Amino acid sequence: MELTEKDAAALVKEGLLCVEFGEYDEAIENYDKALKIIETAEIYLNKGDLFVETELFQEAIQCYDKAIELDPNDSLIWYNKGVVLTDIEKLDEAIQCYDKAIELESDYSDAWYNKAELLKHKGLEKEATICFEKVKELERN
């Protein structure tokens, strides 16, 4: 019997439930089974998020990269990759990811905020202030 996209969606939902209950290995199995049926950015995003939760940052980046390959216009994927790169102190790469998330979704206040924090950390006060001002503007609206 050939598995369908519906089966893949069910496996992803099961994987998400496994994550909620801390059954990470089983979640990975479900995501991998789903990926054998159909490769989607969403599945790679979920798998990447799980790797972040378990502090497997390089694996998370690989999943986000694959998700970006499949859907380069998803701002959440770029944002999540930026967060991981921040965690492993690859600040310039993280800023590039936040920039891409902002390019795709100009009102993405979390991306603006994280970019501002990194710019501040790098001593780029003027650029950081511009980003913080954008966050304030977005939060007011």
Question: What positions do the PLM features span?
Answer:
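Conserved structural position within tetratricopeptide repeats
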Residues: 2, 33-36, 65-69, 99-103, ...
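Register position in tetratricopeptide repeats
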Residues: 20, 53-54, 87-88, 121
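Short coil turns that delineate tetratricopeptide repeat
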Residues: 5, 38-39, 72, 106, ...
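Helix-start (N-cap) detector for alpha-helical repeat units in TPR-like alpha-solenoids
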Residues: 8, 41-43, 75-76, 109-110
